[in-house]
Amino acid sequence: MPNHCYQYVYLAGNPKKIDRLYKAVKEERFLDEVIPQPTNLFHGALGEEERKMCEEKGISNWYDWRNENWLTKWDIKEPEICDEPTFEQDVKIFSFRCWTAWAPPTPVWDRLHEMGFDIHAEYEDEGGMFVGEYQNGEDKCWEPEEEEAC
């Protein structure tokens, strides 16, 4: 079953913040940089016992927390920088390609937009089930025509 969602992401914003995001992309911790995971998450394997233990202790587990907050179970994978950070007027820009599991991390993109970044992303499911485009808080997703599919 297809699992990857491939993305191209363009970001523009405050130079110091762009530098931090650029570093996070290269280290495959982009989503965690924007919406950090709580430090008290359970990070082990998740069977029935572990889920019960988390519920009893009142703590979340990594899997459910990431799905609820990022819409994907992992941070970005296999990032490829398309455009290195450069200045354009008073902002810094860069772009990259990557993939996430299942879906695009639109909550992360929404948070970046709320933080004042200019963000544009294009994404597609590896199985051709959906494609989409996100720009500054607006997400458009559709089922591609057969000739558009990956």
Predicted regions span which residues?
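Long, contiguous binding/interaction regions
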Residues: M1-C150
